[in-house]
C-alpha cells in the first residue's frame, strides 16, 4: 500500500520510526510539512525526490546547489527539479548541514567497511545498503536503476581534507 501524506488538517500527525538500514517511501502532497528527527544521533536519511504525477521530473542536485551558491543544504534552501521547479524547501533545521553530493553506499562499500552480511545469516537484523534500498523503493513505483537520481543525505556533514578529498 502506498503511503500518502495529505495536507487535509493542520493538526493531523503521521509518525513513523525508521530503523537504521531500513527503507521506506511516501508520497508527500503540496502543503505538507515533513519533519525528520535524529533520535539518537549519528543518523543518515537518504532521500530522493520525484514528481508523483510525472515521474520523469526528478530532483537535480547540481542546479539546487548552483542557483543558491552553496555546497550544503540548510534552512532557507530549496530543492529543485530538473525542470526548474521547487520540490520542497527547508523551513527549519537544527542540524545545520545536509549534503547532496556523496550519494549512497553500494554493497561493496558496506561489505568492505563492516564485513559481509546477508539475510540468511542475520535474519531480521540484516541491513541493506543504500543503493539496493533505493532500488526496492523505486520498483514500488514502476521505476528501475535508470531512474536513480542524486539523493539528499539528511544529517550528514561533508568536508574536504587538504588534498580535496571529501570526508
Locate each region found by the language model.
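Acidic, Ser/Thr/Pro
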Residues: 1-167
Amino acid at each position: 500500500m502506498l503511503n500518502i501524506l495529505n495536507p487535509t488538517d493542520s493538526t493531523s500527525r503521521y509518525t513513523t520510526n525508521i530503523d537504521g538500514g531500513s527503507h521506506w517511501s511516501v508520497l508527500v502532497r503540496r502543503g505538507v510539512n515533513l519533519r525528520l528527527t535524529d533520535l539518537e544521533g549519528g543518523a543518515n536519511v537518504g532521500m530522493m525526490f520525484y514528481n508523483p504525477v510525472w515521474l520523469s521530473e526528478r530532483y537535480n542536485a547540481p542546479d539546487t546547489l548552483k542557483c543558491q551558491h552553496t555546497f550544503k543544504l540548510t534552512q532557507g534552501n530549496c530543492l529543485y527539479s530538473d525542470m526548474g521547479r521547487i520540490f520542497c524547501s527547508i523551513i527549519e533545521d537544527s542540524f545545520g548541514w545536509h549534503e547532496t553530493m556523496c550519494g549512497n553506499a553500494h554493497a561493496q562499500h558496506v561489505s568492505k567497511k563492516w564485513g559481509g552480511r546477508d539475510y540468511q545469516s542475520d535474519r531480521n537484523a540484516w541491513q541493506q545498503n543504500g543503493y539496493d534500498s533505493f532500488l526496492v523503493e523505486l520498483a514500488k513505483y514502476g521505476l528501475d536503476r535508470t531512474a536513480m537520481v542524486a539523493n539528499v543525505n539528511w544529517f550528514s556533514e561533508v568536508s574536504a581534507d587538504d588534498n580535496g578529498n571529501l570526508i
